Amino acid sequence: MNKKATSTIKPIVKVIGVGCGGNNIVNHISTSHLEGFSFVACDMDAKVLEKSAAATTLQLGTDGLGSGNSPEKARVATEEKTDAIKQLFNDKPSMTFVVTCLGGGCGTGAAPIIARESKKMGITTVALATLPFELEGERRFSQASEGIQNLARNAEALFLLNNQYIKEQYCDLPINQAFAKADNLLMEVTKSLIRAMTKPKQATKRTSRIKEFFKRLKCK
């Protein structure tokens, strides 16, 4: 685990990007310089982590070469790093947001395990994820479906953004711009959910209300 910077401010919320897509979104969010938030990047690909803007990075696995689009490979690599994952929560944040893009290997296989470890430590854990475009193929959709089930079991709440819906709304745009729209929308959703806790004096009360809200939703 690599820490690029330290802070004396106790984080209210920890935002963890998992996989290349999740880390791209966290890179966007981290530029907002929100006080009291801790940003983490987790990936099997060392090159992705080198480009991360997150203060803390955690390489999953040992070869630094990525998952090869295999959720199972990512799952095994992440299970081997559970001790390091637990250390991410030593600062005892009130909430964890696990941000990922489902359908690939690392995000699909690793994100549920990271959410599980956060939840086991008594931290309110929320997952936010994008779903693949139809043109990405049946395999990615199948892997995304498995990822949804695993995330739902390991988080208090799971928010999904359908990339295909984004494509249909922006059908005149090239696919790379449609991807950018999806990233920006999930970024705004994430920021909106955590913005309610940015005022330190009201953070405890608001966090308690959000915990109660998720319990009533029965999203587990």
Locations of the language-model features?
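Tubulin/FtsZ superfamily GTPase core signature
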Residues: 1-220
